[in-house]
Amino acid sequence: MARYIFITGGVVSSLGKGLASAALGALLQARGYKVRLRKLDPYLNLDPGTMSPYQHGEVFVTDDGAETDLDLGHYERFTGRPATKADNITTGRIYQDILTKERRGDYLGATIQVVPHVTNAIKDFVLSGNDEYDFVLVEIGGTVGDIEGLPFFEAIRQLGNELPRHHAIYIHLTLLPYIPSAGELKTKPTQHSVKELRSIGIQPDILLCRTDREIPKEERRKLGLFCNVRESAVIEARDVDNIYAVPEAYHAAGLDDEVLAAFGIEPRIPPALASWHTINERVRNPEGDVTIAIVGKYTGMKDAYKSLIEALSHGGIANKVRVKLDWIESEVFENEDPAPFLEHVNGILVPGGFGQRGAEGKIRAAQFARERDVPYFGICFGMQMAVIEAARNLVGITEANSTEFGPTKEPLVGLMTEWLRGNELEKRSQSGDLGGTMRLGAYPATLKRGSRVSEVYGGATEISERHRHRYEVNTAYKDRLEQHGLKFSGLSPDGVLPEIVEYEDHPWFIGVQFHPELKSRPFEPHPLFASFIQAAMVQSRLV
């Protein structure tokens, strides 16, 4: 039977519960255990698919087409286990399911209440599908004390009593702020956070304390005394120089040993952390630097590009170089010459996005890369803008544009109205809902034999990648674009949807309709990112 680890947060938000959960999952996995990670999000949205990147950050898409929290990206990158739609749920989804059942009459006229109906639905979700796992780590979004989180805290409190003894523990992630004027770490915020947690019936077994310095023994003793935990269970989670150092740091602090002790388990083998050590050695001792310009729409909120940042880092790890990022708001290029901003970079990446704002700036970035032979990587929207640039400046279709921005005489990019998912036909219309209506999840693509992208994938002609888009490049323009050098080197298996474009006579210019960053791992860098960084190294004359 699976054992459950519930991870909560206190004092402030954005402490890194998702990263802490992922790192602990990696440590348990390194000890030979089978691990599953799940996320409970208290917000009322059905999913984050329609939420602003500035509020929520990245939407992480799974193979089965779920739009989920970015923490699931951490889970995948640290454990290598693909997440599914069954690993993330929101209050909105729970309420939708309950109200659907109520309308059907499933509750036989009962009064629907938070307790027991909402809490039971949460418990059913947490306990479902875990037979093959040794440990299930469940992260509760938000911080203790949030009104919207109360049903989730009540549900995990009940589970602590309902599961067999030694089958559930609670880890509370908290902050120990350092006050320079006092010259000491302050424990009072953590004491109050734990007091709040205990007031709703949850006694943490382990305190995971975020700090920028060593926790003095006296402060550990005080935390143990006033928070009612063993002193050994006060774990120092000190800041590290890169996120892939977290598993080793947590192991050195004794987190995994303390978790096993809380379950009454004698450690059977030490964790196999050699691969994590190798990654950190490469991160800390690079053989050179490359600079990549990210020309995006949401550069003020780096979390909007979380998987992208990590995938570029993985490309650097694969090539033993440090990847420096130069963030450029794409709107700047609508009024400024791109050259002063881009002449010093070794590669240009134009990521996904939605809407007209900043689109012309992305088109100009693609033009600069094409004309100056700078490696260019266009992802989703970035591929579409590269195609529009080619149509305007190579083919001479001056009015080339996307119907996403409004009516146009030359729709190089248009709304997808139907496509195949397996054997089922998906259909969409211009007037349809925004939420959950995109082409989402893993889809196959057929690569042109002998193309650059086929070589990048090791000679493969069939691949599967994750998508999140509503618009597509119009194949009616395919022949004219190819006559001017822009090759369609990847298509959907039925030949209807363009998946990849490239210039054969360019050092490295590839646009993809999918999101390869979602499948990159530190141990297995995505081949497109590894190849892109390698091309940037050539550009920088490192090789």
UniProtKB/Swiss-Prot annotation:
Activity regulation, per record: Allosterically activated by GTP, when glutamine is the substrate; GTP has no effect on the reaction when ammonia is the substrate. The allosteric effector GTP functions by stabilizing the protein conformation that binds the tetrahedral intermediate(s) formed during glutamine hydrolysis. Inhibited by the product CTP, via allosteric rather than competitive inhibition.
Binding-site residues, CTP: S13, D146, I147, E148, K186, T187, K188, P189, T190, Q191, K222
Gene Ontology MF annotations: ATP binding; CTP synthase activity; glutaminase activity; identical protein binding; metal ion binding
Key words, A-Z: ATP-binding, Glutamine amidotransferase, Ligase, Magnesium, Metal-binding, Nucleotide-binding, Pyrimidine biosynthesis
Active site per UniProt: C380 (nucleophile), H515, E517
Classification via PROSITE patterns: GATASE_TYPE_1
Region (Amidoligase domain): 1-265
Residues given in the record as L-glutamine binding sites: Y54, G353, F381, G382, M383, Q384, E404, R470
Matching PANTHER family: CTP SYNTHASE, CTP SYNTHASE-RELATED
Family statement: Belongs to the CTP synthase family.
Protein name: CTP synthase
Originating organism: Bradyrhizobium sp. (strain ORS 278)
